[in-house]
Amino acid sequence: MKDPISIQRIQQLHPQVRQRFTDFITECESTFGITLRIMLPVFRTIADQDALYAQGRTTPGNIVTNAAGGTSYHNFGLAVDLCDLADGGVNWNYDNATLVPIAQKYGLEWGGNWVHIKDKPHFEFRNGHPENPTDLLAAYNAGAIDNDGYLLSI
């Protein structure tokens, strides 16, 4: 992984998936000669997710997510949003579809393949969980988390 900011941000992921995402990003950068940036926030609290969901609905701003609190893999530290760094800035137009074969190799799901909404910067590790991670939310609500707020088991 080339980007020093992404190296810091990867530490926000669930400890059990940090190496998986590091290897995925490193292989993508090596294969395609690009530099990827993990965009913020990586790990969102449920309250943070609810605030993002309210944006453009009940609070000012544009709608930026269709996931309410507890329904995003970001809430469990199991997702990243990636952009290409090019010409000294973030390139939101990079075709992340080129990264999908490598993502699949690491067991990652790409948001650009979703039916109801396309989230092309988004990659998540489901580990057999459904699109809406209700089982992860139930474990979280039951208190099955460590001192840092990560689920004990994913």
PLM region spans:
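Catalytic cores and adjacent binding grooves of peptidoglycan-active enzymes
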Residues: A67-I154
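Short aromatic/hydrophobic-glycine micro-motifs
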Residues: G33-I34, R57, G107-G112
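Short, charged/polar surface micro-motifs in flexible loops or helix N-caps
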Residues: R44-D48, R57-T58, G88
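Stable alpha-helical elements in mature extracytoplasmic
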Residues: V17-F24, D48, D95, L99
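Acidic helix-start/capping segments at beta-turn-to-alpha-helix junctions
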Residues: I38-L52
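Cytochrome P450 catalytic domain signature, combining two hallmark sequence patches
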Residues: G56-A68
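Active-site acidic/histidine clusters and adjacent loop/turn architecture
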Residues: M1-P41
